Structures are given as C-alpha cells and as structure tokens.
Amino acid sequence: MDMEMALGLVKARLNRPPGDTALDAYFKKRIEGAAAKLKRIGIHLTESADDMMLLVDYTVWQYQNRDKAGDMPDWLRLDRRERWLAD
C-alpha cells in the first residue's frame, strides 16, 4: 500500500492543506494501525483504488472518533464487511 498516497488522501478528507506536515508522523501511524487492524480481521489490502479508499475511510473514521464512543457508520461497516467477504 502506498503510504504517501494514503497520507495525502487522509489529509484531503480531513481538509488539511497538503503543505501542513505537523501531524504527518501521527497520521502515518494511524494509517499503519488501521491497515494492521484490517489485516487482523482478515482483510488483506491490495493496491486497488477500492482498498486504498477503504483504508483511508477507516483511518479517518478512527481519527475522528478516537475520543468518543459511537458505532461505525453503516456505509463503512458494510464496505468493510463486503471487502472481508471478498477475501
């Protein structure tokens, strides 16, 4: 998985300017953690655009909900489930 591409997409989803690198190391760890978690539940990510967007969406959701309890949105939960079934 292209980490720099994922980082750029995560920053875009969070409306952070591309030149703002203050949180890049943190976002990279978040992306790595999200990929590892997906792998633990049986999703083996490929280089496809669909897998990249699943990783980005999952990372952004985790980041935005890190301090509050809440269920995963249905669209993301179903996307993750469908990808898991495809493996």
Q: Which ranges hold each PLM region?
A:
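Divalent metal-cofactor coordination and adjacent catalytic microenvironments
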Residues: 1-87
